Amino acid sequence: MMMPKKVKFRKQQRGRMTGKAWRGSSISFGEFGLKAMECAWITSRQIEAARVAMTRSIKRGGKVWIRLFPDKPITKKPAETRMGKGKGAPEEWVAVIRPGKILFEMEGVDRPTALAAMRLAAHKLSIRTKFVGREDSE
């Protein structure tokens, strides 16, 4: 699973997810992409599940780029613990996603194959997404 090798601070505040993505909103590497249409936290487990679904779908053809990285720690207190006694231990890592962000890119396969693979990946994520081609995003 994806997570940072080293972080300056182990715990972060949760923050807010407002506005649109202004970086990473166009296709840079591949021919086709999967674009987020709403705000969400996507966990490292979801990213890995989507990656596996996509790569198995295209078999050995094509190349896949993952354009998101889970760099935000989410903490959780143990079950049946009383309030107080500090912030919980880091439980999982998430990527903060805003609308317009390209999540995955792909090249080396034809459009119908890429669409089918991206659709499988989209079902593994907890947000609405849209399939885009390089000519669509510019």
From Swiss-Prot:
Q: Which NCBIfam families match?
A: rplP_bact (TIGR01164)
Query: In the UniProt record, does the keyword tRNA-binding occur?
Result: yes
Sorted alphabetically, the Gene Ontology cellular component annotations on this record are: cytosolic large ribosomal subunit
Q: Which InterPro entries match?
A: Ribosomal_uL16, Ribosomal_uL16_bact-type, Ribosomal_uL16_CS, Ribosomal_uL16_dom, Ribosomal_uL16_sf
Q: Which organism is it from?
A: Solibacter usitatus (strain Ellin6076)
* Family, similarity comment: Belongs to the universal ribosomal protein uL16 family.
The name this protein goes by in its record:
Large ribosomal subunit protein uL16
For this UniProt record, the keywords arranged alphabetically read as follows: Ribonucleoprotein, Ribosomal protein, RNA-binding, rRNA-binding, tRNA-binding
Query: Which purpose does this protein serve, as stated in its record?
Result: Binds 23S rRNA and is also seen to make contacts with the A and possibly P site tRNAs.
- One of the protein's GO biological processes: translation
GO molecular function terms here?
Answer: rRNA binding; structural constituent of ribosome; tRNA binding
How does the annotation summarize its subunit structure? Part of the 50S ribosomal subunit.
